[in-house]
Design a protein with these regions (language model features):
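A structural motif corresponding to the C-terminal end of an alpha-helix
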Residues: 132, 303, 407-416, 537-542
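Thiamine diphosphate
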Residues: 96, 100, 108-120, 287, ...
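Active-site diphosphate/adenylate-binding microenvironment
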Residues: 8-21, 26-30, 34-39, 380-463
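N-terminal alpha/beta PP-like core and its mobile active-site loop of ThDP/TPP-dependent enzymes
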Residues: 2-369, 414, 494-496, 603
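Phosphate/pyrophosphate-binding active-site segments
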Residues: 2-3, 143, 191-210, 215-218, ...
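Active-site flanking residues adjacent to catalytic metal/cofactor-binding acidic residues
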Residues: 166, 308, 333-335, 420, ...
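N-terminal cationic-hydrophobic initiation segments that often serve targeting/anchoring roles
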Residues: 63, 156, 257, 409, ...
Length: 606
């Protein structure tokens, strides 16, 4: 006789066997069977958010902090739709998350084409999710879950990782599954067809293969050999590491860089690859707000950029793409062939692309590292550039929030992860947060979703088992402020820092520069206002304190040393700014406020 089990019991057990023990979601009729199965499994726990978006961002934070798969769920209709911003966040930042939605009973479907809604809280969430998932499917027969769940898992966790969505009608949830399988494997052709069929209506795998073929090679050994040859010729090489090299790949690359004194520049999402004070750390590339020294080293000083899992999009290298690193050779390693279709050097002159895993290439480089020279003198040049340009920025009065972030980063201690929201505080944080070794800083990168940080920090706590922190602005914190109740209910040890300038500062800066200082909907008195967040936190039963920005060093230390959840609200001036900033049309290493010419000329000459 075949073994039989309830479908949602199988789903729960499958994910538990894969290492997922914490599930994030919000209860509802059409997802009740799944939640019941999670409750009855001795090795799993459901954590209820207060909006499904919070659950989705918690799953993103969990996946980022643990470098592994996460799961979030929601009921049908509005519950499922509320997940979508988190689904998009996982998609753009390559996070493997299994999203599960409840749905109307299949027997309630009318079969009438064009009917606006099949029943109460019914919505075609699969079609809505397809553009921001690697795979999305509705299960119409209970036994199909075995193949589809195994397939979805493999798709989420291989290649360029990302989210999948499984839509479960209520009657299917309570159905039975025969002969459950937990380790079904699929060929590359099967997974590619499943992922890419939606791109062109049926020839997805061929479409994907065509994109791969436009790279120079999909062979890791060939990519490693090209890099080794280029390193032999180079005098001023740089490793550029992005989120696509996350995990063991980045560790191997850092080890190689350390042994051979190769400077390392990262993307924002890969900001945690190196500790703040690591001698190899040459900052974060950024077309608008990157570190001055990173932008100068990459764009104007290096003669070889070896890029691992970094997209080199306009957000990173500026809008004048063909002018980036004109004097450098570029070798790009990326698992996503579509990223490699971005042409950096016009006509691909001095640019080689390899559609292959960064980890595979890193392993081959490590095996042949006796062929790599040491670049200690060049690293010293880069460290000098970092020191001198950091000093230039420290003398900029408008950067006082950066100094607060630097101080707070030392006060937050050994937090397992720090989630940062979207706004000016994000720039201040990735520019100035002094992260320790193995302390992760989490961002909503590609999607740039306000309201991300608090729930992401919650998810990171369950991923690491350690105290966590989040840094938010007054605009972003308001977006998912209801999750303070989640923090209180489960006594989550999260230190919340709200930097309150009573404005949407990033847009206010834009309005000052381009809209004649008309601050529509961004400032108090002009259509926007903020509350007293410390009072709100106290209403939830959470310890909270409100201080003025100039009092940070005197008033924050003892407060942040307490156990349990705490909120520190820091009042800033209304007119805050993020610097350095690249103006439209300028090279990314020539940011405002401009470097004094004698210093600029001297650094360009060394």
């Amino acid at each position: 006789m075949s073994d039989k089990m309830k479908l949602t019991d199988y789903v729960t057990e499958f994910l538990q066997k894969k290492g997922i023990h914490d599930f994030f979601g919000y209860q509802g009729t059409m997802i009740a069977h799944l939640v019941d199965s999670i409750e009855h499994n001795a090795n799993t726990k459901s954590h209820s958010s207060y909006n499904e978006q919070g659950a989705a961002f918690a799953a993103c934070g969990y996946a980022q902090a643990k470098d592994s798969c996460a799961c979030a769920y929601a009921t049908s209709g509005p519950g499922a739709v509320n997940l979508l911003s988190g689904v998009a966040d996982a998609y753009f930042d390559s996070l493997p998350v299994i999203f599960i939605t409840g749905q109307l009973n299949t027997y309630e479907y009318s079969g009438i084409d064009g009917l606006r809604q099949q029943g109460f809280q019914e919505i075609d969430i699969v079609s809505m999710a397809k553009p921001v998932t690697k795979y999305a499917v509705q299960i119409r027969e209970a036994q199909d879950i075995v193949r589809e769940l195994n397939l979805a898992w493999q798709i989420a966790n291989t290649g360029r990782k990302g989210p999948v969505l499984i839509d479960l009608p209520m009657n299917i949830q309570r159905g039975e599954v025969s002969d459950p399988v937990y380790d079904m494997k699929f060929s590359d052709e099967e997974t590619e067809a499943a992922v890419y069929n939606r791109k062109d209506g049926g020839n997805g795998a061929a479409f994907y293969r065509e994109a791969v073929d436009k790279a120079d090679s999909a062979d890791a050994a060939e990519a490693a050999e090209e890099i080794l040859c280029k390193l032999k010729e180079a005098k001023r090489p740089v490793f550029m590491i992005g989120h696509g090299a996350a995990g063991s790949g980045e560790k191997i690359l850092v080890d190689i860089a350390r042994k051979h004194q190769i400077p390392v520049i990262t993307s924002v999402l890969a900001r945690s690859v190196l500790a703040w004070d690591d001698p190899l750390n040459c900052g974060c590339i950024g077309g608008a707000y990157g570190h001055r020294y990173a932008n100068m080293i990459a764009n104007a000083k290096s003669d070889l950029l070896v890029c691992f899992g970094i997209s080199l999009c306009t957000r990173q290298i500026g809008t004048k793409v063909h002018e980036f690193a004109r004097c450098a050779q570029i070798v790009r390693v990326d698992i996503d062939p579509y990223n490699l279709q971005r042409e950096i050097h016009e006509g691909r002159e001095g640019e080689k692309c390899f559609c292959v895993s960064a980890e595979d290439v890193a392993e081959r480089l490590a095996a042949a590292e006796s062929r790599i020279s040491s670049y200690g003198d060049w690293l010293e040049v880069c460290r000098r550039i970092r020191r001198e340009l950091t000093q230039v920025d420290n003398e900029t009065p408008e950067r006082y929030p950066n100094r607060m972030i630097a101080y707070l980063s030392d006060q937050l201690g050994d937090t397992g992860a720090v989630a940062v929201d979207v706004g000016q505080h994000m720039v201040w944080s990735y520019q100035s947060f002094h992260n320790k070794q193995d302390q992760k800083i989490l961002f909503s990168g590609g999607h740039g979703a306000m309201g991300y940080a608090l729930p992401a920090a919650i998810g990171a706590h369950y991923a690491t088992g350690k105290p966590v922190a989040c840094i938010c602005g007054d605009g972003a914190f308001q977006m998912n402020i209801q999750e303070l109740q989640w923090v209180k209910r489960e006594n989550i040890p999260v230190k919340m820092v709200v930097m309150n300038n009573e404005a949407l500062g990033m847009i206010r800066h834009l309005q000052r520069d381009y809209f004649d200082c008309v601050y529509a909907d961004t400032s108090d008195g002009s259509g926007f206002s903020s509350c007293d967040f410390s009072d709100v936190a106290k209403a939830y039963g959470i310890r909270a304190k409100r201080i003025q920005g100039e009092d940070v060093e005197n008033a924050s230390g003892e407060f942040l040393e307490q156990n349990g959840p705490e909120l520190l609200e820091i009042m800033l001036e209304n007119g805050t700014y993020a610097y350095p900033k690249t103006c439209l049309g300028e090279p990314i290493h020539n940011q405002q406020p401009y470097i004094p010419k004698p210093i600029f000329d001297e650094l360009m000459e060394i």
